[in-house]
């Protein structure tokens, strides 16, 4: 007896659909004042579609409070997704603040700082020594 495996392509398609639907539902259906302007960056589904990690960024408001509010509203959002998606199992939603942008900015700052330090050291090494 063979088990039916889900296609990786189907997993990606469902994750993309959840991302689009959640973006719209959060904007139109969730009225929590702790949730400002939110962008859903990505959705990661487990192979059995039981759980979904939703990565978001918040343009306004405190990211921790936004995450708390989104996780609080996850049951309501799950029910709304159930009405939209045509799949047997709608995943339990777990919201996570996506720190990729902040980490990228910090890495860029560190690289720039290292390059300026290196350039300064090179300039000092190239300068002729002064003899008195």
From Swiss-Prot:
The keyword Cell membrane belongs to this UniProt entry's keyword annotation: no
Molecular function GO terms recorded: ribosomal small subunit binding
Keywords, comma-separated and alphabetical: Cytoplasm, Ribosome biogenesis
GO process annotations (BP): maturation of SSU-rRNA
Entry annotated with the keyword Cytoplasm: yes
Principal localisation: cytoplasm
Region (Disordered) residue spans: 113-132
GO cellular component entries: cytosol
Subcellular location as annotated: Cytoplasm
NCBIfam families: rbfA
Subunit structure: Monomer. Binds 30S ribosomal subunits, but not 50S ribosomal subunits or 70S ribosomes.
Purpose: One of several proteins that assist in the late maturation steps of the functional core of the 30S ribosomal subunit. Associates with free 30S ribosomal subunits (but not with 30S subunits that are part of 70S ribosomes or polysomes). Required for efficient processing of 16S rRNA. May interact with the 5'-terminal helix region of 16S rRNA.
Similarity-based family: Belongs to the RbfA family.
Record protein name field: Ribosome-binding factor A
Organism from which the protein derives: Burkholderia ambifaria (strain MC40-6)
């Amino acid at each position: 007896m063979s088990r039916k495996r889900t296609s990786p392509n189907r997993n990606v398609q469902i994750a993309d659909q959840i991302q689009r639907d959640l973006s719209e539902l959060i904007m139109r259906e969730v009225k929590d004042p702790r949730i400002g302007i939110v962008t859903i960056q990505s959705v990661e589904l487990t192979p059995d579609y039981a759980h979904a990690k939703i990565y978001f960024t918040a343009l306004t408001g405190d990211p921790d409070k936004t995450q708390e509010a989104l996780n609080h509203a996850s049951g309501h959002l799950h029910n709304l997704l159930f009405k939209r998606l045509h799949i047997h199992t709608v995943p339990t939603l777990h919201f996570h603040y996506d720190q990729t942008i902040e980490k990228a900015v910090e890495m860029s700052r560190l690289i720039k700082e290292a390059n300026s330090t290196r350039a300064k050291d090179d300039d000092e090494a190239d300068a002729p020594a002064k003899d008195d």
